[in-house]
Amino acid sequence: QYLVSDFYLKLRSVMPKNGYCIMGITWTDLYPKEELNFVLGEASGAHKSGVFSFGRFEPKSYNPEMSSDIFEIDEKILWRLLKVMSHEVCHLFGLSHCEYFLCAMNESTSLHEAMSQPLFLCPVCLRKLQTVCKFDLIQRFQKLETFLSQLKRSWYIPEIERSIEWLQRCLHFCKEGDTDNSDGFAE
């Protein structure tokens, strides 16, 4: 088990000059400080770096004799990687833990809590990220849909299919508005 902050300076030293931040991935379990026994991931805005571990996900799968081990992941691990990495990268863009809605930025104290959170940001956190990154919302949803659709061609992950469907509903709403009228109100 490694102290997560020990990675920050090393990661920062290998970050490309034109990079905004850098993330490290390890199979070895991490802990954030002596008082806490584990963390799935952590990011430091000051160091513009973060790290997350598969140690809690698949502790028996780590083989120190095989350096290629990190590339031999299955669908379950890939889904977890997407969720934890996107959460930590959002920290690097200045987002803190969300207390408003069900959100990718909710704090978690267990693997179960982390995996029960959505992949996507709530409206409050999405707006915060949009303010920092200056992205077009529709283009962002389209790029996420394209990325997840490409993953879907190579991996069978039911959560990806549901995520694509959610993105398609968001895109439809952004482009067409709410045409359902199921609330009973006339336009």
Model feature map: region roles:
Residues Q1-S86, L92-S96, F101:
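Metzincin-family zinc-dependent endopeptidase catalytic domain
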Residues A46-R80, S96-E187:
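Metalloprotease/metallohydrolase-associated module, dominated by Zn2+-dependent proteases
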